[in-house]
Amino acid sequence: MFIFIMNQLFCDKKDGKMNKDFSALNKMMQDNLKKQTTFSDGIKNLLQLRNNLMEEIDLIFQTTSQEDFFALPFPKSKGNTNATIAWSIYHIFRIEDIVCNSVINNKTQIFFENDFQNRMNSSIISTGNELSNEQMIEFSKVLNIQELYNYAKLVKENSEKMMLELSFEQTKSKIPEEKKEYLRTLKVADDWLIDYWCGKNIRGLLQMPFSRHWIMHVEACLKIKGKLHLKK
């Protein structure tokens, strides 16, 4: 059964069906969010996209060995595959936690509120963008994978609660300029990333990082896993 699941997983990725499905739902969601009359459909499609992607993340956790979580099979890649699976999943949800709670809202990040730095045994509190390949591997080796999964689930749940409470008018709101300085004091993201987030309105943030960012890194994880699978 395990072999069948793995073969099916990698066949789907190879023929591009999954990319196409994610892309279509993502485009529909983006179009829906632009109009008040279709806004609620946009939120539904966003939640559906995230659930579909979370199913892939769940499968990764269920079928990946501890060693494969910190493997780096594409060290020369210039794209998102130049990463470990552990780092990629941490990165997805760390960014989402920061954006949901510190950029859009004025709340304590789940990472800090629930002591996930200690629970995950994380050597960093940031998004991880600053790590070299060697640092990324070392970071991933000591990360508590079960607590990483717990963090991902809590962040997803928290973000989706916010999404369901948003109105169409609220999504037009720009991030206040003064938020930049506050975010810098947290020391959780590079300046260029803070500038990027604060240059968006809430609708723009729903599109990235709450959806497209997931697609980019989940698909990278699946390619990493596929490469590791072929080596065995």
Question: Where are the language model's segments positioned?
Answer:
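Extended intrinsically disordered or low-complexity regions, especially N/C-terminal cytosolic tails and loops
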Residues: 2-68
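Short, contiguous alpha-helical
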Residues: 2-28, 70-130, 157-160, 177-232
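Short glycine/proline-rich turn/loop motifs
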Residues: 37-38, 132-142, 193-202
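A structural signal for alpha-helical segments
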Residues: 41, 45, 76, 80-83, ...
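An acidic intrinsically disordered interaction segment
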Residues: 47-59, 174-187
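Hydrophobic faces of stable alpha-helices that mediate helix-helix packing
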Residues: 54, 58, 152-156, 214, ...
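Acidic/histidine-rich alpha-helical segments that form the ligand environment
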Residues: 123-174, 205-211
